[in-house]
Amino acid sequence: MGRGKIVIRRIDNSTSRQVTFSKRRNGIFKKAKELAILCDAEVGLMIFSSTGRLYEYSSTSMKSVIDRYGKSKDEQQAVANPNSELKFWQREAASLRQQLHNLQENHRQLMGEDLSGLNVKELQSLENQLEISLRSVRTKKDHVLIDEIHELNRKGSLVHQENMELYKKISLIRQENAELYKKIYETEGPSEVNRDSPTPYNFAVIEKTNVPVQLGLSTLPQHSDAEQSTAPKLGLQLNP
């Protein structure tokens, strides 16, 4: 058998009434949520129980829904009555002018102007605002400086790594040159290396048996005064 038709009237039993209220409340909240999601609607729902307890649901925020409702209702009334519409926009313009005046006055006071009409309490409030603003500015400045320092440290680390890599490459090149020179020295002999090497001084060894060894500068054959004055040759001279 199907369910019988429920008569819509107040439930006298308090327990049954509370159970029905809880079930119906959850159901209507579920429907409101589905409506907001499926139809992209802004939904606001408020329910007061018989005991005065508030239950509410809003797809955005209840305050924005109520504000939108009040504004929409005023606009509808203004459209219905041209005189009311004119008064509405006049009030809006006056309110905006007042807000602009307040902002300009507050700005001048923050800049230290137009302070003659303020009492001690108002001056203290203005001082507190300035201190809060100054702390915010200093905090932001500190954060910016810290970020810049971190960035400079990062760049410094990169430069240091690049220098280390360059130093390793230079050391490797020097090692390769030393090995290459050693191979040439072993292949061609000391005489070939000394003859080909562009050293500014030449070492000569003169040997005689049973003769004391003395070190000195040996003079190469004299060709001309110009040649003799340029590039003296370093030699090992054995004198009798």
UniProtKB/Swiss-Prot annotation:
SUPFAM superfamilies: SRF-like. Probable transcription factor. One of its GO terms (molecular function) is protein dimerization activity. Pfam families: K-box, SRF-TF. The keyword Glycosyltransferase does not apply. Transmembrane segments: none annotated. This is MADS-box transcription factor 27. The gene is MADS27. The keyword Transmembrane helix does not apply. Residues 1-61 form the MADS-box domain. One of its GO terms (biological process) is regulation of transcription by RNA polymerase II. PROSITE patterns: K_BOX, MADS_BOX_1, MADS_BOX_2. Residues 86-176 form the K-box domain. GO terms for cellular component: nucleus. Ubiquitous. Its main location: nucleus. Residues 220-240 are annotated as: Disordered. It is found in: Nucleus. Residues 220-231 have a biased composition (Polar residues). CDD domains: MADS_MEF2_like.
